[in-house]
């Protein structure tokens, strides 16, 4: 059984063109985006860089939101373009894999879009780093089924596209997406908790 699993993994790996410049660019874009928005958000929190540049916290947040959204569009386009050049693999092609890909992509989009609807622009795009805090924690769907629906939904969407197209390279990119979001959460969750703890502490001292 172990040998068969190893053979499957080897076949999937051999179906990835690691030398493709578009594939490499897709990896770079996937890694760059969360690093970028975390660095910019930290700079905003400590130095109010975007607030000063844009003439207000809300305007600064909207600027960051537009930038992150645009970078996401570019990343998705690069991903799609990279997959077109990559070979398919018989291990993940066929009607069932296609249906699974559609289902995962659909689920991912539901999580992403419903999360954005619940949080709004400032809640989705790091408004708390600008001092734009939510009154209370959102607990309704999709947050009652997922702790981080934006990140998990995005990962599922990448995975769904990979399976729909039968491209092992897409599985690699999806794995990078997953691990980059895991790393991002290690930065974001404690920092966000600190921001709200400071807000609550300030309220008590008033």
From Swiss-Prot:
> What domain of life is recorded for the organism?
Eukaryota
Give the residue spans that cross the bilayer.
54-74, 102-122, 166-186
Q: Which reaction does it catalyse?
A: a 1,2-diacyl-sn-glycero-3-phosphoethanolamine + S-adenosyl-L-methionine = a 1,2-diacyl-sn-glycero-3-phospho-N-methylethanolamine + S-adenosyl-L-homocysteine + H(+); a 1,2-diacyl-sn-glycero-3-phospho-N-methylethanolamine + S-adenosyl-L-methionine = a 1,2-diacyl-sn-glycero-3-phospho-N,N-dimethylethanolamine + S-adenosyl-L-homocysteine + H(+); a 1,2-diacyl-sn-glycero-3-phospho-N,N-dimethylethanolamine + S-adenosyl-L-methionine = a 1,2-diacyl-sn-glycero-3-phosphocholine + S-adenosyl-L-homocysteine + H(+)
Segments dipping into the membrane without crossing: 21-41
Cite the InterPro entries for this sequence. PEMT/MFAP, Phopholipid_MeTrfase
Question: How is activity modulated by pH?
Answer: Optimum pH is 8.1.
Q: List the ranges whose topology is Lumenal.
A: 1-20, 42-53, 123-165
What is the similarity comment for this entry? Belongs to the class VI-like SAM-binding methyltransferase superfamily. PEMT/PEM2 methyltransferase family.
Query: Mind telling me what this protein is named?
Result: Phosphatidyl-N-methylethanolamine N-methyltransferase
Q: Which organism is it from?
A: Saccharomyces cerevisiae (strain ATCC 204508 / S288c)
Its gene is OPI3
């Amino acid at each position: 059984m172990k040998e068969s699993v190893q053979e499957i993994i080897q076949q999937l790996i051999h179906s990835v063109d690691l030398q493709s410049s578009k594939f490499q660019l897709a990896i770079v874009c996937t890694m760059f985006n969360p690093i970028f928005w975390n660095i910019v958000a930290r700079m905003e929190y400590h130095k109010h860089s975007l607030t000063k540049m844009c003439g207000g916290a809300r305007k600064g947040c909207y600027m960051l939101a537009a930038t992150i959204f645009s970078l996401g569009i570019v990343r998705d386009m690069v991903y799609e373009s990279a997959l077109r050049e990559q070979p398919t693999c018989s291990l993940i092609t066929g009607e069932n894999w296609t249906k699974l890909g559609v289902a995962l992509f659909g689920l991912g989009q539901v999580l992403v879009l419903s999360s954005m609807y619940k949080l709004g622009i400032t809640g989705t795009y790091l408004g708390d780093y600008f001092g734009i805090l939510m009154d209370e924690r959102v607990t309704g769907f999709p947050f009652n089924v997922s702790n981080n629906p934006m990140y998990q939904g995005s990962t599922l969407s990448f995975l769904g596209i990979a399976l729909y197209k039968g491209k092992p390279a897409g599985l690699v990119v999806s794995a990078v997406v997953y691990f980059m979001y895991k790393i991002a959460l290690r930065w974001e969750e404690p920092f966000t908790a600190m921001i709200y703890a400071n807000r609550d502490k300030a309220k008590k001292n008033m």
